[in-house]
Amino acid sequence: MKAHEETNMLESMVVLIDTREQPTERAKKRYEALEAPYERRTLSYGDYSYNAQLPNGKWLFEDGETVSGYAVVERKMHLDELASCLTHSRDRFEREFQRAKDHGARIFLLVENATWENLLAGRYRSQFNEKAFFASLCAWLVRYDLQLVFCKEETSGKIIKELLYRDLKERITRGEFDEGR
């Protein structure tokens, strides 16, 4: 891919937001913080992914198509929600991560308002024992090759966009989309 084609592809990037993400006031602030075009689409897994226009004019994912992204961000509001996903909703959560892994997607698990220190100290609302929570999360990081990101909710939009942009840039650099010329 030529340099100008790479630039055009990166500039065409649109952040995809899963239709199941509720458009709350907090979410709207996150969308604004993306500082990038975005659209709501049905994602096979994850809460955020991306689309981009190939040099031949086609998009990675066509309108109406359920998106199985190359990279996804699974966002959780806090440790409480993550604890619930690893206990009460574990089967559903596991199926979603397995689908992403089977598809070869890069998975970022982003947890707002969280730190390792808060997890290890049990500073969250759940009966999930902190040692079990820690062990379970570490096992998931290894099992699904997850990249874990803790951040404040104010910065999550910016981080989501940058992670997706960098994944797209890396794939372009490696030539993964060269056949779409």
Range-by-range predicted roles:
Residues M1-S68, D80-R181:
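Non-catalytic C-terminal interaction segments of nucleic acid-processing enzymes
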Residues A71-M77:
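Conserved catalytic cores of phosphodiester-cleaving nucleases, focusing on short active-site segments
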